[in-house]
Amino acid sequence: MSKVTKQSKSHKSSELVSLAEKIKQKALENRKQSREESQATEEANTASETEAAVIEETAEPEEGFSSFRELDLVPELIEACDNLNFTKPTPIQSKAIPPALQGKDIIGLAQTGSGKTAAFAIPILNRLWHDQQPYYACILAPTRELAQQIKETFDSLGSLMGVRTTCIVGGMNMMDQARDLMRKPHIIIATPGRLMDHLENTKGFALRKLQFLVMDEADRLLDMEFGPVLDRILKNIPTKGRTTYLFSATMTSKIDKLQRASLTNPVKCAVSNKYQTVDTLVQTLIVVPGGLKNTFLIYLLNEFIGKTTIVFTRTKANAERISGLCNLLEFSATALHGDLNQNQRTGALDLFKAGKKSILVATDVAARGLDIPSVDLVINYDIPVDSKSYIHRVGRTARAGRSGKSVSLVSQYDLELILRIEEVLGKKLPKENVDKSIVLSLRDSVDKANGEVIMELNRRNKEKQTRGKGRRSRTATRENMDKEEE
C-alpha cells in the first residue's frame, strides 16, 4: 500500500504526528552525525575483520582477454561496449565469452551481479549481426523483473545494430504480446510459463529456427518447479544447430540433469562462489521480544533515515502492511511483491532506483536477479527459512566494493533459523546496539499506526471482494507459475 487514503490521513492521532516530528528531528541529527562518522566507520570496517559475510566471487588468475577490443567483435558491438563503459571484463565474462564466440555450448556458474548477462548477450549479438533472422535467440528467466533487466541489457548492447527485442512475461496482456511476436523480434526474453502459453496458443509463432537458447538463473528456474515446462519448451525447439547457454549460481543434481538433456559438449566456466568474509558488509541481529517487531523496525528506519533500505518480508501481506506503516509514519516507502501486476512492480522498482522512494519493502522476489545499485541497508523483518535466501538478501547491499549493512530482527521462533545461517556463514552474528528506551517510547504510537494500516487494508480487501462478487473466475493459465512465492 503506497499511501493510505486521505480519510485515514485526516484521522491521524496527535501521537502519530508527534512521532513523525521526532523522526524528522532525528533525521537532521543523523545527517550531521553521519558526515562525521562515515569516514571513521569505513576505516574501521576496512582495518578490522568485521562481522561481515557475503558470497564473493574470487576469480582465478585470468588467462582470457583484458579488453573487449581484443575480441573479434563487430565494430557496432565494440562501440556499444565503449558507450556502456565496458572496459575490463568480469571474471565470468573473461571465461565464458571466448568459447562462446567459438560456438561452444556454455555452462556458466556465477552469482547475480557478476556481469553474466553480458557474458551471453555479447556472443549472441555478434553472431546475429552476420545471420539476422527473426526468433534468433530465446532467453528464459525465472522472474519478470530479471527478464526485463535482460531485455534492457540486450537493448543497450544492440543499440547500434538495429536489434529488435521483446519481453514475454506473465501479468501482461497476451494479445499485446502476440502482436509483439508477430513483429518478428530477433531476441525473445521470457518467463517459461508465458512462453509456453504463446507456443501453444499464438497463431504463427514457433521457434523451429531458433539458434540460441539461454536458461538464466537455472537453479531458480528449477527451484520454482519450472522443470516440466522447460521439458515441454525443449520439445518445441530444434536440437540440431542450436547453441545453448545455461547459467546458474550452483551446480546441483537437477542442473546436471538439465544440462545433459539440453547441452552438447558444453564448456564449464565457473567463478568461485564460496562464502567468504569481506569487510564491506556488516551484519548484525536484534533479538526482538514478542509484539515489538514493528517498533524495532521503525526504530531502525529512524536511526538510518535517509539511507536507501530494502526491508525483506516472508509474505506479500506483510510487505503491503509494512509499506503502509512506513508511509503513514512519513517514511518514503514502496512495496514489491507477487500480487502486483507488472506495471506496478516496474513502477515500484523505478521509484526506488530513482531515489524517489528510499525504502523498498519486498518479498524474496527482489532478493535475487535484480541489479539495484547503492543499497545502504538491508533489514530482514522476517528471517528466511533457508540460508541461501538469506545470503541472496544481504547480497543486495555491499556490492561492487561498496560498504553496506544488514540487520535481522530475530524472534524466539527464529533462533533455529539463525543458527543454521550462522553455521553456513561460519561465524556468529553480533547483536546490533539498540537504545531500548527509545524503542519502548515508540511502541504505543507504532502499534496505533499499525492498527490503522490493518483497518485500511481490510477495508480495501472488502471493496475488492464486493467488486468481484458475482463475476465468473476465468480459467487460470501458466501465468500463475510466473508469480513468485510468498
Swiss-Prot record:
Query: What keywords are annotated for this sequence in UniProt?
Result: ATP-binding, Coiled coil, Helicase, Hydrolase, Nucleotide-binding, Nucleus, Ribosome biogenesis, RNA-binding, rRNA processing
Alphabetical GO biological process terms: maturation of SSU-rRNA from tricistronic rRNA transcript (SSU-rRNA, 5.8S rRNA, LSU-rRNA); rRNA processing
Q: Which domain of life is it from?
A: Eukaryota
List, alphabetically, the Gene3D superfamilies matched.
Answer: P-loop containing nucleotide triphosphate hydrolases
| Biased composition annotated in UniProt, kind: Basic residues | 1-11
Domain (Helicase C-terminal): residue spans on this chain: 300-446
Subunit info here reads: Interacts with the SSU processome.
Q: Under what name is this protein listed? A: ATP-dependent rRNA helicase RRP3
Q: Which organism is it from?
A: Eremothecium gossypii (strain ATCC 10895 / CBS 109.51 / FGSC 9923 / NRRL Y-1056)
